Amino acid sequence: MSNISTTALGWAAFGAVPGADEEYRAVVTRAEEWLAARIGFTPHARRAAHDAPRVTPDALVSAIIARYGKDRTFSIPILTTCALAGRLGSGKQSWRWVLPLPFELAACPHQWFAALHLPVVSYALPALIAIGQARHFHLPSRNPAARLARKLTRRRTLKILAQIQPSSGGFLEATPLTSFVVMSLAGSGQANHPVTNQGVEFLSKSQRADGSWAIDTNLATWVTTQTVDALANLQVPMANFSSQRVEQLAGGNWQSAIQGWLLRQQYRAEHPYTHAAPGGWAWTDLPGGVPDADDTAGAVLALAQMRKADSQASCESGCGAPGAEILAAARAGIEWLLDLQNRDGGIPTFCRGWGALPFDRSSADLSAHAIRAWLAWADEPPADLQKRIEGAISAALRFLAKVQRNDGAWIPLWFGNQFSAGEENPTYGTARVVSALCQARRRFPLADNLLVKGGNSLLASRNADGGWGGSAAAPSSIEETALALEALAALLALQDLPAGIPRAELKSTVLLGTHWLLDRVESGAWTRPTPIGFYFAKLWYYEKLYPQIFTLAALGRVAQVARELAPAGPNADEPIAGA
């Protein structure tokens, strides 16, 4: 679906290229009409009676800021792009529409950042520096103290920007953030700066054959750990998932290859960018990654699952990475997550204590993932670590109780749905939390209260066709149906289903969802991705492997309860053939 962020950026791109407005007049006009229809315009803003409405800077700025609220991480880069492209007027006065970013604060010790309540999120330091400098270059602050501070820290913050730029040149290995930095530097007299040159090189190398760029270039760590998690649901030896092709690609035993690869991705030193402590994992194996909660939890879980598979298969040496090495890596990851936990009991993405802005706050899906990771290693010594894990899970459950909606749902942070109210995705969030609660309830009684409301929320949000969308009545998708189905099948597998969840309805819903998903598998539609990924600045992405991974996880979980789903009677047909 079209949205104001991408349309404004696309419209600005045509303005930035000399002659593009005239050469592609029809495209530019349609974009202006779309924007004007959604943000409003004044009658005198028409060029002539027969022309399309003109997008006025005040209306555009108001709409962009309203979309993102007080978080300047997203609104200011978009408006800076518009200013650099001449879409907010001409001359330095066009920059009055771009709120200044206090880039001078980047010169402070990094330990101060959380307390300073920066107007951008923890991972946006490059944007704070580069975009802040662009605004200062074109329209310095009227405040003499701020103007002097920015003048004095300009070189120092540029040096910091160079220090935190990864060797690939791409900040977070992401096109949008890197582009915002490059264009801001180039537009403020720094076109030949080393950061600019390395950023341009990254963008040149990452352009696709059709001339476009992907939002993210590499999610290798994330999709690998998600795949291992999905395979674990099948409850058969992982060694069975092999072939000559797989062994050839892995250079031998594929489990050993993945274990070794994951161990090499763990950060062994403080991260130069966010100053995260050692022990975490990023979403990618490329140098621009930053350790985060979701990927660290995913890696810790994957190591536990493969270690369990090795043990069950009674492998000799060479079947996997040494047990001691895996245990040490897992403990480091567990402690990294424990140290990341906020005072509210929830888990944020990158940094502890940066709770002023939404993308730095604790979130339900990240907290649920951390709970699963902690539970996977909760019985490992030493005793003091076990005690910390128990306390952390209890705190995380209290956080989940606090943020659960009245309808029983939870909202995730990094996933959304364009067809749902507020572009949220309660299906993703609720499914992830319900799956974690099914595992936590054996030790933590509080989980059952949350589980009843969460499970019933998933039951109530199923569509009439048997599938799920991002929320009730949103179009059903492979990803969301698989996520909901996996969670409900895990619920159905419980020997003592919590009172308040109707078993008959649960069984029928799982059966309907299974049929919906199997129909898509058999037709080949199960490989078609949906843009449920939520990137910074409310930009959307899809991942080709999501529907396949989530479907595998869901059907593996359903297979565990297949006997319960089978109809009564010796002559009954098998209802979920193929699952």
Ranges and model annotations:
Residues 1-29, 33, 37-46, 53-142, ...:
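An alpha-helical repeat/solenoid feature that recognizes helix-turn-helix modules
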Residues 146-162:
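Edge strands and adjacent loops of beta-rich recognition modules
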Residues 164, 249, 312:
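Conserved small-residue-rich
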Residues 197-207:
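Surface-exposed extracellular loop regions of Gram-negative outer-membrane beta-barrel proteins
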Residues 243-244:
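Generic detector of N-terminal low-structure segments
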Residues 573-579:
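Long, low-complexity, intrinsically disordered segments
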